[in-house]
Amino acid sequence: MLGDDLINGEESNTYSYMAVLQKLLTDNGYNLTVINKTLQGGGTLSMMKMAGVSDETLQGYIAKHQQTANGAQLNVTETGIRDLTDEQTTRNDMDCVPVIFMGYYGGWNHDPAELAEQQEQILNTFPDKSRFIVVGTRPMDSSVSSDTLDQVLSQKWGEHYISLANVTAQPSATYEAQQAMAEAVLQKLQELNYISKG
């Protein structure tokens, strides 16, 4: 699991989609561990940094965002990268099927095509680029609609894509939406034959 954790604090351990997915896997007889590489309240630049995308690439995005803003005030996630711990940047997920869920807090210039490109930057850090899932949700600031986002991301990722708006009408940061998202990810893992009860 790479990207956003929308349930902040201790409650994440129970109600976030990562926790719910782990429970669903176990309850359904899968002996698989969900590896949590998410950030609470982090932008996509920080997620790329955590995945090991080069500083040069990250600086390119920052420069582009500043240029687009043309002197206007930018959200911190559009230019800021978190200080990450060694534990956060250590890749213990290289043999996993990446489930990429990012963009809620910004960092992609309100441009779904750039978000897709950033998702690909993260996917490219994995040895197996053929097995993955991307989940999309409209950003917290509603600067891009679900329809616009889904159109670009579903075209880019095809059968690998899950639109959270198609799965639940609940706001993405609610427990209900997190539950629905975990169920959709499990269904997609099964549908694409990524997991087995071995």
Identify the meaning behind each predicted range.
Residues 2-5, 36-42, 100-106, 135-140, ...:
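Active-site-proximal beta-strand/loop segments in catalytic clefts of secreted hydrolases
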Residues 6-113:
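Conserved SGNH/GDSL esterase-like catalytic core that processes O-acyl groups on lipids
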Residues 22, 26-30, 103-104, 124-131, ...:
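Sec-exported extracytoplasmic/periplasmic mature domains
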Residues 24-25, 158-160, 167-198:
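Histidine-centered active-site loop/cap adjacent to the catalytic His
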Residues 31-37, 135-136, 195-198:
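Surface-exposed patches in mature extracellular/periplasmic domains of secreted proteins
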Residues 82-89, 112-120, 124, 179, ...:
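Amphipathic, non-transmembrane alpha-helical secondary structure
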Residues 119-179:
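Substrate-gating cap/lid alpha-helix
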